[in-house]
A protein has these predicted regions:
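Core AdoMet radical
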Residues: 1-87, 98-113
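Auxiliary Fe-S-binding modules of radical SAM enzymes
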Residues: 86, 90-161
């Protein structure tokens, strides 16, 4: 996986990628970045058709500032990917955010995710009217760990006409 908004990616290339996405409205593109500052810097140069969903990774409170960079874009759907969630995210400002995805880390040496962190994010989404999607608990065997939270799965997504 790569990051379209990496500093080494020229604006002209980003504009070409957006042009392709603009020309294919039958597809929904979920673009995810960790570089919210660069996103905020170049967003005004891009054509944001409704099929381009923009998101930022927010894995712990050290990077909560990324939400502000996302919020300032003209994307029609704005989302947070809190995966892997490696710490609590208290007091998020979810104004202008449409969707939050939460998941634990998987692989050989995953850092544990606390249920309390997930429940707090879910509560914050409810307060702000934001769709909440719980992807997985993570771990060395993510299928075995599953994706059930409070006795059910959480699959809310924005509906775009």
């Amino acid at each position: 996986m790569s990051d379209l908004f990496h500093e080494a990616v020229p604006l002209t290339f980003i504009m070409m990628v957006f042009e392709v996405m603009n020309l294919t409205p039958q597809h929904t593109y979920q673009v995810l970045t960790k570089r919210a500052d660069r996103l905020a810097e170049v967003a005004k140069h891009l054509d944001w058709t409704p099929n381009i969903w923009m998101g930022v990774s927010v894995e712990d409170k050290r990077v909560l500032h990324r939400i502000d960079g996302l919020r300032g874009t003209p994307a029609h759907v704005k989302f947070l990917s809190c995966e892997p969630l490696i710490g609590p995210l208290p007091g998020m400002d979810l104004r202008g955010i449409d969707w939050v995805i939460v998941g634990g880390e998987s692989g050989r040496k995953p850092r544990p995710m606390q249920e309390a962190w997930v429940l707090d994010i879910k509560r914050q989404c409810e307060l702000f009217g934001v769709d909440f999607f719980f992807k997985q608990w993570g771990g060395t065997n993510k299928k075995k760990a599953g994706r059930v939270l409070e006795g059910r799965t959480w699959d809310a997504m924005p509906v775009v006409a």
